[in-house]
A protein has these predicted regions:
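C-terminal catalytic/substrate-binding lobe primarily of soluble NAD(P)-dependent oxidoreductases
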Residues: 4-254
Length: 254
């Protein structure tokens, strides 16, 4: 978004962040990162920004097919993702900002079951468990979602058999020199290539590499000034250059 604002727009009006995982890990149900965080994130209410206010939606209420490069159309669901909250502050011409993520029908079916049987609960429940010394039972307290995390596949172990790719980008509409323009910047990341390089799947790769680059920008003094800042408040050019060099090459469509 910052790169687009610097190079291609006088005003950004509409921003859609689009996140597609078109991979297959060959598991009946698994999350690509911490199950506790992932399930809580997608079962909470959706949120987007429009005309100066935030609009809340029911979980997964708003969805539409979006077409992703080299992947094709995938059903995409509006979620609450916190980066929108800073972007609309730092780019105040934005009229609407939304975040979209893809999910397959099998994943959503399992998610419905998890919710319906109470396994997505984050409050404590009492459970009778055998005592460690084998002398009987005792009442212990467990959080259902934390227990579910313990029995689901470990996201770190998914990479070996993961096939396909991710596609993450920003679709932007705004004004440059008095005329309306559209711009799409995105990266596609192969799960197989990510595993060959790091032993991890593509979702972990696309999460970790940008964070590493941000830390490098700070440590080298490229991104450093007094106070607390979000990444979009710094010069985007060196960051985008490093994405190309560190395994996440990006592409543009106008």
């Amino acid at each position: 978004t910052a790169y687009a604002a610097k190079h291609y727009f006088d005003e950004i009006h509409y921003l859609d962040i689009v996140d597609c995982n078109a991979g297959n890990h060959h598991k009946a149900f698994a999350t690509n990162f911490n199950p506790e965080i992932n399930i809580r994130e997608i079962t909470q209410k959706g949120l987007y920004y429009e005309n100066g206010k935030y609009i809340e939606t029911e979980p997964m209420e708003i969805h539409q097919p979006l077409t992703y490069p080299n992947i094709g159309p995938r059903e995409s669901y509006l979620l609450h993702h916190e980066e929108i909250e800073s972007l609309v502050i730092n780019f105040p011409t934005i009229k609407r900002a939304r975040f979209w993520m893809t999910f397959g029908q099998q994943y959503l079916t399992y998610l419905d079951v998890i919710q319906n049987i109470g396994m997505s609960r984050i409050d404590e429940v009492e459970y009778k468990a055998p005592k460690a010394d084998g002398t009987g039972e005792e009442v212990v307290k467990i959080v259902p979602l934390q227990f579910l995390k313990a029995v689901l596949p470990n996201p770190q172990d998914l990479g070996e058999n993961y096939e396909g790719e991710t596609s993450i980008g920003c679709r932007i509409r705004g004004i440059k020199d008095g005329e309306e323009h559209t711009y799409y910047v995105y990266n596609n990341c192969s799960h197989e290539e990510a595993y060959k390089e790091t032993g991890m799947q593509g979702v972990s790769y696309t999460t970790g590499v940008p964070a590493m680059i941000g830390a490098m920008m700070f440590l080298k003094g490229i991104w450093r000034k007094p106070g607390v800042w979000n990444v979009e408040q710094f010069d985007p050019d060196p960051f985008m250059e490093q994405l190309n060099q560190k395994g996440l090459p990006w592409h543009e469509e106008f």
